[in-house]
């Protein structure tokens, strides 16, 4: 179960109430009155915990679990241990996420790191022209610049700087040591520690006798329900804006260049870099360490495998991989042929044998 020093659960709940709140069903209606006090993995859960099984790889852990209750797909119901009450869901992991949010709402929406919510710490600095909504939390060392607007119930973490003119919507969590400049953030945005948003894009007119800096005159627009992982960077536009679409989730250590436009619901995994003026459609997935060159389009629903190097436009709904990135079936065939070639060379067989 979660360490109570860091993660304090809300009040215990009955399985009947949980099932109702997440839109799932109990395998046995008589279990509706059973109480659980929190969530935990299958291998560490106790009799008062609720767990889940989503990946069949963990079926053995499910058969041996001491959890009091478990969320499972109906196909696993008949093989459940006798001691485990079941909540049935076609999407167990999603259902578990909803339950974990119920028990730990602060973790789902950002937890302040110092003091109580709704307080402005005496060591926070707020410009007289800034406008703060009700219930705003400012932690020690926060600086709020001229003309800044912050929505209701937003938390700004320790030593974070919000530059002049920026706006932050309601119910946001901006973690410690973040810098925001030239940026507008929507509602329910979560920004993890160390993120940099709105700094200069990397723009230079290159040549002799020296490289001339091009003033970056755009902004960063972060729409509602976006999450940006620790130590990621989002450069402001050179003239057009850099845009992060609604519901997009960005992992740690991601670089997003100037003028990039990212659609709704995209997933961008750690150490990915997106060069300037590239456009991503809706629900694009970029796996870890993907590199994307500038001035191209990755259309909606496309997926790029880890370490892929995207140098051309990617059609909608396609899976690409490799260096340079290509349709994933083609890339896999190339990998197989290279392995065959390597074996032939080691054995001294000619390639056409």
Curated annotation (Swiss-Prot):
One GO biological-process annotation of the entry reads: lipid A biosynthetic process
| A GO molecular-function annotation | N-acyltransferase activity
Alphabetic keyword roster? Acyltransferase, Lipid A biosynthesis, Lipid biosynthesis, Lipid metabolism, Repeat, Transferase
Pathway of action:
Bacterial outer membrane biogenesis; LPS lipid A biosynthesis
Name the catalysed reactions.
Answer: a UDP-3-O-[(3R)-3-hydroxyacyl]-alpha-D-glucosamine + a (3R)-hydroxyacyl-[ACP] = a UDP-2-N,3-O-bis[(3R)-3-hydroxyacyl]-alpha-D-glucosamine + holo-[ACP] + H(+)
Protein EC: 2.3.1.191
Where is the catalytic site?
258
Cellular component aspect of the GO annotation:
membrane
Instruction: State the family named in the UniProt similarity comment for this chain.
Output: Belongs to the transferase hexapeptide repeat family. LpxD subfamily.
Q: What does this protein do?
A: Catalyzes the N-acylation of UDP-3-O-acylglucosamine using 3-hydroxyacyl-ACP as the acyl donor. Is involved in the biosynthesis of lipid A, a phosphorylated glycolipid that anchors the lipopolysaccharide to the outer membrane of the cell.
The protein's matches in PANTHER family, at most eight in alphabetical order, are given as: UDP-3-O-ACYLGLUCOSAMINE N-ACYLTRANSFERASE, UDP-3-O-ACYLGLUCOSAMINE N-ACYLTRANSFERASE 1, MITOCHONDRIAL-RELATED
How would you summarize the oligomeric state and partners of this protein?
Answer: Homotrimer.
Annotated protein name in UniProt: UDP-3-O-acylglucosamine N-acyltransferase
Q: Which organism is it from?
A: Parvibaculum lavamentivorans (strain DS-1 / DSM 13023 / NCIMB 13966)
């Amino acid at each position: 179960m979660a360490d109570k020093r860091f993660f304090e659960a809300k009040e215990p709940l009955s399985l009947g109430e949980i099932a109702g709140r997440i839109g799932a069903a109990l395998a046995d209606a008589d279990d509706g009155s059973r109480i659980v006090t929190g969530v935990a993995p299958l291998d560490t859960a106790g009799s008062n915990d609720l767990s889940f099984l989503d990946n069949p790889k963990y079926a053995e852990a499910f058969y041996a679990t001491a959890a009091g209750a478990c969320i499972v797909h109906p196909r696993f119901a008949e093989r459940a241990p006798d001691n485990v009450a079941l909540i049935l869901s076609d999407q167990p992991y999603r259902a578990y996420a909803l339950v974990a949010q119920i028990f730990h709402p602060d973790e789902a929406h950002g937890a302040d790191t110092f003091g109580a919510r709704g307080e402005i710490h005496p060591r926070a600095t707020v410009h007289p022209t800034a406008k703060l909504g009700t219930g705003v939390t400012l932690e020690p060392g926060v600086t709020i610049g001229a003309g800044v607007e912050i929505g209701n119930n937003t938390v700004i973490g320790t030593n974070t700087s919000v530059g002049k003119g920026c706006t932050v919507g309601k119910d946001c969590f901006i973690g410690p040591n973040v810098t925001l400049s030239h940026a507008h953030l929507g509602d329910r945005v979560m920004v993890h520690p160390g993120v940099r948003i709105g700094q200069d894009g990397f723009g230079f007119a290159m040549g002799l006798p020296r490289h001339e800096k091009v003033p970056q005159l755009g902004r960063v627009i972060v729409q509602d329900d976006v999450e940006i992982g620790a130590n990621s960077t989002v450069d402001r536009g050179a003239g057009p804006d850099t845009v992060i679409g609604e519901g997009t989730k960005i992992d740690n250590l991601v670089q997003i260049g100037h003028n990039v436009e990212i659609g709704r619901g995209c997933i961008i995994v750690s150490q990915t870099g997106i060069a300037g003026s590239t456009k991503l459609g809706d629900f694009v997935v970029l796996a870890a360490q993907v590199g994307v060159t500038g001035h191209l389009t990755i259309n909606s629903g496309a997926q790029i495998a880890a370490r892929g190097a995207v140098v051309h436009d990617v059609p909608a709904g396609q899976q690409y991989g490799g260096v340079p990135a290509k349709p994933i079936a083609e890339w896999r065939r190339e990998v197989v042929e290279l392995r065959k070639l390597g074996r032939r060379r080691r054995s001294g067989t000619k390639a056409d044998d």
